[in-house]
């Protein structure tokens, strides 16, 4: 399955290229730069006539932040945002993703390899309250201690 996916985004490369590429990935940043940025560029080239953004100069690369977005496209929007950050020399964010989008173990590995935080859904009200508190503490700690920025979609 993965070889077919890679072939789509790296059509000029041999299957050995994919094996070597995967072996060369040592960090999440490596994965995001070597694989995900290529994927996002491919999506933009094949689905958009034009892509522009503004306001990036309002982000201080030396500080961590919380990026809030609407719930329009929970996968593609943050992926594009990561590419914009990367292209502007700003560290990429962690991304909160609902567990309803994690359909199998392979998807979970891919999501976690892309600096994503699993948000548990479909639980009791009490469990949701406790889970939300834990997520809030995690976000606050990461930002206030300058560990990482967070991207979060809201409804």
Language model region names:
Residues 69-70, 78-79, 96-99, 122, ...:
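Glycine-rich, histidine-containing beta strand-loop boundary motifs that form or position
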Residues 80, 131-138:
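Well-ordered alpha-helical segments embedded in enzymatic catalytic cores
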Residues 63-69, 135-155:
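Conserved Motif II region of HX4D acyltransferases
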Residues 94-130:
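Conserved nucleotide-cofactor-binding alpha/beta core module
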Residues 1-65, 71-82, 86, 108, ...:
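Membrane-anchoring hydrophobic helices of lipid-metabolizing enzymes
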Residues 46-49, 128-133:
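A conditional alpha-helix N-cap/helix-loop micro-motif detector
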Residues 84-95:
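A short alpha->loop->secondary-structure connector
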């Amino acid at each position: 399955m993965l070889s077919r996916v890679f072939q789509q985004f790296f059509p000029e490369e041999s299957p050995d290229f994919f094996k070597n590429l995967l072996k060369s990935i040592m960090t999440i940043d490596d994965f995001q730069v070597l694989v995900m940025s290529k994927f996002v560029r491919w999506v933009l080239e094949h689905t958009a006539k034009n892509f522009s953004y503004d306001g990036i100069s309002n982000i201080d690369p030396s500080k961590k932040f919380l990026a809030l977005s609407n719930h329009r496209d929970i996968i593609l929007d943050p992926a594009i945002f990561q590419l914009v950050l990367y292209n502007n020399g700003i560290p990429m964010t962690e991304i909160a993703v609902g567990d309803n989008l994690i359909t199998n173990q392979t998807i979970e590995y891919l999501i976690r390899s892309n600096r994503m935080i699993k948000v548990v859904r479909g639980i009791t009200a009490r469990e949701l309250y406790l889970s939300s508190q834990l997520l809030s503490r995690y976000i606050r700690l990461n930002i206030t201690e300058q560990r990482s920025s967070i991207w979060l979609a809201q409804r």
